[in-house]
């Protein structure tokens, strides 16, 4: 069975760093946009936590997981096969 493709953690980290270091400071602290950015950060952190839970579940079920950097990796493999 092929490994289950999942996003590399760096994708989450890059988005979180951008939102926390740049976007939060670009919007007014008392604005609705500030609250939306805050909620987006929370959602990304939850998504990363859920992905880690999925990986643990796969490990317990002896299913391989492969962290992907891009969709191009998939296309490259499909071309090879």
Regions found by a protein language model. Give the residues of each.
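N-terminal acidic leader/helix
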Residues: 1-30
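Low-complexity intrinsically disordered segments
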Residues: 33-81
